[in-house]
């Protein structure tokens, strides 16, 4: 086995969301968070000698400025001629290789856009080609799937059965079905003959959570769908769904967190021990950053890699040889693993054996060509035409069952389906063959179409009244260029031979493997403190020892385990490094040399052994907390990150070290001050957590920030996929927009050899400078809105200017250096110091509204940092979101922080993304779910014991939820909805308050909770009965309200507690008028509804005087 980690395969340090290997095995495409598509050569990835050869290109092409947002999916067509990409910009683009290389600069190949598919209303999560290349399917967060034909790339059908975001697709290898998996916790199988739902599978996903992708796959024999994100007995599983009756088969058990991607090898293997036994290989990738390899013939996993990645695995792709594969992760890296035939226990079968295998399952309806590819419905017909009829071939799979299902659905039998089924592939196949031949000729005729010709077929032309034509332009790539099918990337002959011989080592046994590349070292050269960019390699030695099977992994029946292990739910154990000699790692420097001497490396190795299972100390002084045996990318990491502390590459290392020492001194002084002055009224933490600090912004000589007019919470949601990027500043030059703050920092050397920094602030509007100021010091953070802007310097001085450049406030000295500086669109400025204290100023009033309030308490806070911060528009309440996804808002009315996110609430049936509510509360809570998915693996370096001391896992919470009685679940749901109402009030979100009020009313109505409904309605109606009893004695008592004073829970306190007629600007009685029809849906409540309805109508008809209005008029 060989494991490689080429860090030069990168997307600027951002996440890599998709990876796919070309059918010829010599190219691999990646799509990432930088909105780029990159095509790499596989030889340097899979072979060290090719990586070192300067004559072999690594990056073949980088497609830039095409997509506007993150590229979520890249897929090669089955013939390898085209590459499809799907992005957050709602576009699917088709790329082809042009033989016009005149425009090439730094790349080897020229890939141009052949077609742009528009039709989705939201992010495209995955694209997938049909097995016969006749269709391409795209799925999106708009809850739909669009089928496009690949002749002219036009829409064929739009499938809209899903109720939530569609996050994964897989085609039946026989072309009969398409399967899609969605956030609505369902797997839908569609018939490709008429694009109608065949069945919906929901059972394994009822208790599953959410993840950014749900990528299922289909086994090459067509017998099983391997679905993701399954939950079985509070354990995360990969789910096998049988083709025969769409029943749940086996569960692949062992991942600690959700399985988000499954990929099946396209090969069918024959077992070495039993030649008659055939099996398939399945790869699973999870949020626990673990890869697991499974065989359909074994109840246990064949391989587990736990330390290859630091974060969630997003995509996997098999090589065409069936022995190797690549995977990509949210941490922005790619891994390559190559296995030997003996390690998987078999070898791929040939075309003849494959033909016999398929005939046993599907009869003569499926045949195999000379290359081993499936041909559909070719019995007695033309093979070429049958191949092109692929998706519409009617296979005789359970014909009686299918006929009965269609008969029940339609009432009477369909002539087409009846003929197709009864014919058993006879007349039905003939019809499909004719269509297939026609399509085949069309495919041949369009195979030479160029981008310009194809665009002319799709472009829109409008005839104007004057006879002129208006043509809507379509992006077609780079002019008229010939699109050719890419040929395999050539490498020298001696490297081909070396590549062939590199896999000649064979293990001695067929046992499950567990690899942990971060814990197996063989030489001092594998120092984790090295900053080189070499490829990490793990290979088997010539005399491997027998490897211990991984106990908790096993194929699990729905009602029992196959492997008989009683420790089924235990965590996978880590093997002792001292007893494991199966793998070794060595690092090679291909880009730059390490600046550490041997003594430093040895010290780093010792520190790594002692700290590898501890939580990283964010911002602390221990520089060895960044130790990792895997090589890191040479590109800069984001400033705000959960990852370990990095060293600055600028010339200000000494200055930053002095700042860190001063910061530590300040923390110690503050701690002593707090202990010696217990009676001080200042809001200062009595104990500052040891080592807790927030990373300071990266020092740069140019800062530009665009002042955005949209609400801050909306931008926070839009940027949720990049939570670790600095929310305050960007260093990208040439920012466009209406208003820009631009800062240029210069340094001047004085006579005493000291350096003085000056910052020039320019306020630009449509590239026109409105004003300019020059201040002493080095500005680190800027923020503002269209009315004012604020800046802080390295010396911890805060300046605030108005829109004309006049100082509003200046020389404000916070308690420490600032790590965050944020503003809203009105008058509030938020600042967070590096030691975790929050201040909010009202700039218009020139006064502080929150002074040095410590961040909220969190368990293990020293291992967390702030993801982003914001301040609300109306009242200027600070909102802080931590790296674990938890969000808090400070309420001056309560005088404490209020937690917005709720892990138990995430299990509620009402907590779903399928809502049109997009207020600040749902934004923050959705952010919590998405960020926890993206960064779910950030604590992988924490030991199992420390994880147990932290918050309970989702699996345990699910187990707890499942064990609750119906009454307990009702109490939990009621509590969750009441929390939502309270949080909406704290955040002053009136629309969300109304949204949750209606849901709360509906829930109480379904449960027939008369006490809480009466409480709610009485509060919305107001203390009318009590006040009128006092003002009018008993004139309207029981006549108008129908309620006695004792029946009104608010009546006894109505005189002492003033009642407000509005809540968050909404009229309470108008809200009561809206919820009464909901309550009327339960006839048990009709008497109570009638009483409140009568009282409400009395006010509108002036029969009953509104006592609240009477009190106001006095």
UniProtKB/Swiss-Prot annotation:
Instruction: Note the segments forming the WD repeats.
Output: 10-50, 66-105, 119-158, 161-200, 209-251, 262-304, 308-347
Question: Low complexity bias: where?
Answer: 515-545, 649-681
First-listed, main subcellular location of the protein, grouped into a coarse class = nucleus
Where is this protein localized, as stated in its record? Nucleus
The terms under GO molecular function for this entry are: transcription corepressor activity
- An example Pfam family from this entry, by short name, is Hira
- Bias class Basic and acidic residues marks the residues at 565-578, 596-611
For this UniProt record, the keywords arranged alphabetically read as follows: Chromatin regulator, Nucleus, Repeat, Transcription, Transcription regulation, WD repeat
Tell me the PROSITE patterns matching this sequence. WD_REPEATS_1 (PS00678), WD_REPEATS_2 (PS50082), WD_REPEATS_REGION (PS50294)
Q: Which intervals carry biased composition (Basic residues)?
A: 581-595
Origin: domain of life: Eukaryota
Q: Where is the composition biased (Gly residues)?
A: 412-429
- What CDD domains does the entry give? WD40 (cd00200)
Among the record's GO biological process terms, what is one?
A: DNA-templated transcription
Stretches for region Disordered: 405-449, 499-682
- Gene Ontology CC: chromatin; HIR complex; nucleus
Q: Which InterPro entries match?
A: CAF1B_HIR1_beta-prop, HIR1-like, HIRA-like_C, HIRA_B_motif, Ig-like_dom, WD40/YVTN_repeat-like_dom_sf, WD40_repeat_dom_sf, WD40_rpt
For this chain, the family text in UniProt reads: Belongs to the WD repeat HIR1 family.
Q: What is this protein for, i.e. what is its function?
A: Required for the periodic repression of histone gene transcription during the cell cycle. Promotes replication-independent chromatin assembly.
Instruction: Supply the name of the protein.
Output: Protein HIRA
Q: Which organism is this entry from?
A: Dictyostelium discoideum (Social amoeba)
